[in-house]
Regions:
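Bacterial Sec-dependent N-terminal signal peptides
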Residues: 1-25, 425, 437
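Bacterial Sec-pathway N-terminal export signals of envelope proteins
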Residues: 16-69, 75, 229, 235-274, ...
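Small/polar, glycine/serine/threonine/aspartate-rich low-complexity segments that form flexible
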Residues: 20, 67-108, 238-245, 290-322
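Periplasmic alpha-helical coiled-coil/stalk elements that build and connect Gram-negative outer-membrane
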Residues: 27, 137, 141-255, 365, ...
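Sec/SRP-type N-terminal targeting helices
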Residues: 40-44, 57, 101, 114-141, ...
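Short segments within alpha-helical structural elements
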Residues: 58, 205-227, 380-438
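Outer-membrane beta-barrel pore domains and translocons
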Residues: 67-73, 111-113, 158, 168, ...
Length: 438
């Protein structure tokens, strides 16, 4: 018995843990910012790209390395010298061999950069690339916020549509039952009954389609919120109870720079830094170096012998490099960087105009939806009352079926218009709030 109770408690706690209740679109946006897989992946990539700072800083720091070389001189250089220098006869020559066949050298080398302007420019380019990555994350967050707002309201819209369609189906069922009774009594013809029955079937099919759309929207919303398909997501808000704001004047358009524009601005700055870096390639570089080497030369492979000498070589100096001619490569790179800068500036101007147009379009859509909302709500209430009145009249025989059908179709049109209008109001209102940083 205790084991069954324990299992029940575990199952209950699992169900509670997997159920997510969202009461507002702001909660949905906060959850998406915390748990969206794409955002989390972008944050991890940002941390990985942070290591690029160390990679670009390395050429400006001292470098040290240990090295060892083994050479086998299978053909040593030979020089002819007069034999008289070696005690021979004048006019004769002796051949002298230079070096030994087996050479082993090992040592340490340290290099310290003194002047390297292109490498310092690379640091600025790396920092700018990291800023671009941050701006790309802001663009991704903005896109996910917009998608979340649209899917959140689409889910509420389809849920409301299901509720209204269920009421329509209930009225169609009642009408079909009345028509069936009249058909059995011979009051109406089979044609009228079949038409009523067809409306009932069509309404049932619309209900199934709305239920499918609701499930799809809910699953897509789970995906954006970082939930598994098996997790439970409950939206407790009712759009009809949320207060709608007033029209938004043009002066209240979002003043914050859109992330898309900021991203293009950072790309323009990157192009400027890259152009400057290509120009710095003309500057010379200066580095100091020191090298210490121990070398052994043998006639046989006996380097482990302690009786043979090792020779020490030490050197320190400065290396100055000034590129004079590179076959036109520097000029080509500078020209390419200039063209990339112009392309980035063009993209920035286009993106700024695009975002301004988009903001204006959202504002106009929202204002139009606000103006139409009250009219559509009144129209919906009137059409709902008309359906009830028409059903009573049809039941009492005062209305023909065609008259009732006209009223019913008008009610369907009013319902769809009201739901779409309500959804447009809150979707565009939420998007404007997101773009205002609220």
């Amino acid at each position: 018995m205790n084991r069954l109770i324990l299992i029940g408690l575990v199952l209950c706690s699992y169900n509670v843990r997997c159920q997510t209740i969202v009461s507002s679109v702001q909660e949905a946006l906060e959850l998406a910012h915390r748990s969206n897989p794409e955002l989390r992946n972008a944050q991890q990539n940002r941390q990985a790209q942070e290591q690029q700072r160390r990679a670009t800083r390395a050429p400006l720091l001292p470098q040290a390395r240990f090295f060892t070389n083994f050479d086998y001189n299978y053909a040593l250089p030979v020089q002819l010298v007069p034999a008289e220098f070696l005690g021979g006869q004048p006019g004769e020559f002796r051949s002298l061999r230079f070096g030994l066949p087996y050479v082993l050298a090992s040592g340490v080398e340290v290099t310290v950069p003194v002047i390297n302007r292109p490498a310092r420019a690379d640091q600025g380019i790396t920092e700018q690339n990291l800023r671009i990555t941050d701006n790309q994350m802001l663009v991704l967050q903005d896109e996910i916020s917009t998608q979340t707002a649209r899917l959140y309201h689409a889910t509420l819209l389809t849920r409301s549509a299901i509720s209204l369609t269920q009421k329509n189906l209930s009225a169609a069922d009642t009408l079909t039952q009345i028509a069936r009774d009249r058909l059995d009594k011979g009051i109406i013809e089979p044609l009228e009954y079949n038409r009523i029955r067809a409306v009932q079937l069509t309404t049932a099919d619309v209900l199934y389609q709305n239920e499918l759309a609701y499930v799809r929207n809910l699953n897509q919303l789970k995906l954006l919120l970082g939930l598994a398909p098996s997790d439970s997501l409950m939206l407790s808000e009712d759009l009809a109870n949320r207060p709608a704001g007033g029209p938004v004047p043009a002066s209240d358009l979002p003043r914050l720079e859109r992330p898309q524009v900021t991203l293009e601005q950072s790309r323009v700055e990157l192009s400027k830094r890259q152009l400057n870096r290509e120009r710095l390639q003309r500057w010379p570089t200066l580095s100091a170096y020191g090298r210490f080497t121990e070398q052994a030369q043998r006639n046989a492979f006996n380097f482990l012998s302690t009786n043979q000498p090792w020779y020490q070589i030490g050197v320190a100096g400065l290396q100055f490099n000034w590129p004079i001619y590179s076959g036109g490569l520097r000029t080509s790179n500078i020209t390419r960087a200039r063209l990339q800068l112009k392309a980035a500036e063009t993209a920035l101007a286009y993106e700024r105009n695009k975002q301004q147009t988009d903001n204006e379009d959202i504002r106009n859509t929202y204002n139009q939806a606000i103006r139409s909302l009250d009219l559509n709500r009144q129209n919906y209430e009137l059409s709902r009352q008309n359906v009830q009145i028409a059903l009573i009249k049809y039941r009492s025989g005062l209305f023909a079926y065609d008259q009732y059908l006209n009223v019913f179709n008008e009610a369907l049109t009013a319902q769809n218009r009201y739901l779409n209008n309500l959804s447009n109001v809150f979707i565009n209102q939420t998007i404007l709030q997101i773009r205002n940083g609220q």
